[in-house]
Amino acid sequence: MSTRKTKEIESANVTFIDILNNVPPENASLTFFAALPCSRPYLNDSSPYQPITLPSRYNKNDSSDMFFCKTMNTPSTFPHILAFIRKEILRSNHLTWENLDREQIGPDIVLLVHLGSGGNGFRDTAHGGVLAALLDETLGCCIESWAIQLHASEQASSATRPRSYTANLNISYHAPVESPGIIIVHAWLKKREGRKWFLGAKILGEDGRTRAEASALWISERVAVM
């Protein structure tokens, strides 16, 4: 079976923000999820979210993101993924993570994931490591989105933006996740202290029940002083 690919844009050095702004979500995934009731809060006209291509699913023609772009991009693993970002994160030049009412505004990044049986552990049950990878990837998309906008507002555009890496990911599994099936992954920024980024995430079933929760620490590289 051939691996599906998102539409490519003509750039040898495509960036994360290029993908968010210029690569539309795959029509097949939009059509698939639009038929499911769980997607309506994110796809309706009044939604605070914008559908995006998950950057790690985009084929960059190099060795980056091979796990999500190739290995887990098959009919038996993750046949469909549709990502969403809070519109404010893309559009605001004065972002703040302080005093945000998460009950009111919701998560920063949402992933709708169609799980195939290729990621199973027990029979008809998604492997915990697969769920951990989805949590980590959603958290990564969250921090990268924030970091790009904050970097643009805090420093000269010519300054190099440091990379950030997972330093700690603590997951609590509450219930098995049936597979094949549909899950919803939420991720949000809690706070930032210098190079440290504190985030939260959770996995919901199609019925809205929480299946897993995570807290994470990401750390940005030190910026070299010239």
Stretch-by-stretch model annotation:
Residues M1-S179, R192-M226:
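Terminal targeting signals and extreme-terminal segments of soluble enzymes
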Residues S179-H186:
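A structural-propensity feature for long, helix-poor, extended segments
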